[in-house]
Amino acid sequence: MITTEVLPASRWRDPRDLPAVLELPATGVLIGADRQQKPVALPAIGPGPTRLGVLGDHRIATLLAYRLLGVGCRLTVTTADPARWRRLLAAAGDRAVVGPSALGWPAAGPRGAEPQLLVTDLPAAPPVGLGDQPMCTVLHVATAVPTGSPYWSDVDGVLLAGHGYGTPLARLLNRPDAGELDQLSPGQLGLLDRERAVVVTPILAEAELALLTD
């Protein structure tokens, strides 16, 4: 769980402390630093669709969405509880819409030429073909690893907070290295993409801390 009430300086770093951030690829979203203090980015926007998952704390999705708004994404949130996303929606302003379903996403016309982000916390995972076009990113937030889900069986990346998610991911994705993410210390996140499993210490700016405080 991301804890924002008390944030030890030794765990949560300021972006200005990491000069190598400038070397990150344009399609990656900075998450934080690994155990060697190297920047870690999550692939999030590409020439094809990107499918992501978040496990354990919806505020991870808030952070990702906020950073993707900063690189020009238009945001759609599908949820049964819009209040859960109120701070993110307020920050996004007219670049965000919220509703109970993803009907009509991704946008067509001039808006469809911009990067499109769909964040959903609905119990059912999105259809695997949703947003199957360039610069479309889908992010599903779940409290447990959805077994038997075609979407989750083909995710490009997962961020997780808390204990016990690594082993189910290892089974679902045939990724034994995901088991290394079962035991995260307070203030840490686990990142699993198609190439690696890594423990990450998040890097948060002051504005992001305020955004993540309930």
Regions found by a protein language model. Name each.
Residues 166-214:
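Conserved GTP-binding G-domain of TRAFAC-class P-loop NTPases and closely related GTPase folds
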Residues 49-184:
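ATP/nucleotide-binding catalytic cores
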Residues 1-98, 194-214:
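Extended, compositionally biased accessory segments flanking or bridging domains
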